[in-house]
């Protein structure tokens, strides 16, 4: 029984140990799971791998930077080599240019020294590389002793440029110092004011050793006198002002001299004609001469004399303008008629004249001419002798100052029954052109004053010269055969204004219908007596009607 009992006891102990081991293993396995709950191994592995990747990227970036820097360094080295080659080529060119001017390079001596050193080198292999490098370097010459004066002028050798051998002309000239004689030396005169001001010095400004104020100027202002003295600046300003005045005077003199030199005769004549204060211009009609008659002193007040001033001036103009040299009988009859009609005219009739006949109430406008009379200079008028029987004019129902209506007559359209043959062989008489009798001196300007006396009334009347009578056949033949008188002398522009316009040539014939229409407006049955009546009636108004008639009957 002992054998079976031992077997079961051993089996029981084995089962207990297995149970203990299984419980222990379960406990250990449970404890390990609790320890790795906060951080799992996969997480740790991922973090470790990410750290490795970051380190790898940093290493790659640093490596790239190193490569780029190496490339830049290599490019810089290449540029330095190229620059070295270029500088060497430039140095060779400079040496060649210097050699043309006598420069001797020193590289031959260096090459000979290098060759001697290479021949003297021992061929031992035990020599260290440092000693070999030291032997390869050229032996430097000992620097010259620096015993020169530090205050001397700098030389090219001080900067290592003595081998360029620059020309000696650039060096400053060496002047030998002259021995100084103590007798010839004079003390330097210090600057002093011409009139120094004695000013009491304050205790702070008191000087004991030096009294030299050569660099200090008071400019005329001090504690004692706070006013500006006449110092150098004011004198300089006055001097400049005088110079400017002299310059302006010289410029004005030069300008005057230049104007006098460049002045032409026209400028000189204009300068002589011009006055500082010219009188107002006098307007007059050429050919209209006004004769001033001797005045008769009449008793009376000055006011009445001034009141009659306008009437007297009108009568004076009428008397002056009628003083013409005319030998025709018709003109003499007009003059006699004018003398007969003058006494009947009074002050009221003159003052009631129309505006183109009245001279106005201005007393300063004495001897003011009437509107100009346009006549043909040099053309004599021949009138036929008429009977001296005076025809009484008809009474006008309207205003006496109103001129009669002009008669529209075209004399050149009248048919002349007696046709005259024109003899071309006979020379046409040249009209006598005399301009001097029309162009005479104008009357002097008379100013209004208390001493002025009204001129006496004269028995003359102004009138327009009558137009010469020309037959129709003569004028037509003249224009037909283009027979023209000789050309008159040259006239000025002012005389051309008074010249009667020339009748144009008629190139087209007027038809019978037009002549019949025009004949209705022409009063061909009027007798000579009626014409003389109209002329005499218009003479009292300055013969305005005759002017209109002449304008309408003018042969264009």
Curated annotation (Swiss-Prot):
One of its GO terms (biological process) is mitotic metaphase chromosome alignment. Residues 105-135 are annotated as: Disordered. GO terms for cellular component: cytoplasm; kinetochore; meiotic spindle; mitotic spindle; outer kinetochore; spindle microtubule. One of its GO terms (molecular function) is microtubule binding. It is found in: Cytoplasm, Cytoskeleton, Spindle; Chromosome, Centromere, Kinetochore. Keywords: Cell cycle, Cell division, Centromere, Chromosome, Cytoplasm, Cytoskeleton, Kinetochore, Microtubule, Mitosis. CDD domains: SKA3_N (cd12957). Residues 118-134 have a biased composition (Basic and acidic residues). Signal peptide: none annotated. InterPro entries: SKA3. Component of the SKA complex, composed of ska1, ska2 and ska3. Component of the SKA complex, a microtubule plus end-binding complex of the outer kinetochore that stabilizes spindle microtubule-kinetochore attachments, promotes alignment of chromosomes at the mitotic spindle equator (chromosome congression) and assists suppression of the spindle assembly checkpoint. Kinetochores, consisting of a centromere-associated inner segment and a microtubule-contacting outer segment, play a crucial role in chromosome segregation by mediating the physical connection between centromeric DNA and spindle microtubules. Belongs to the SKA3 family. This is SKA complex subunit 3. It comes from Xenopus laevis (African clawed frog).
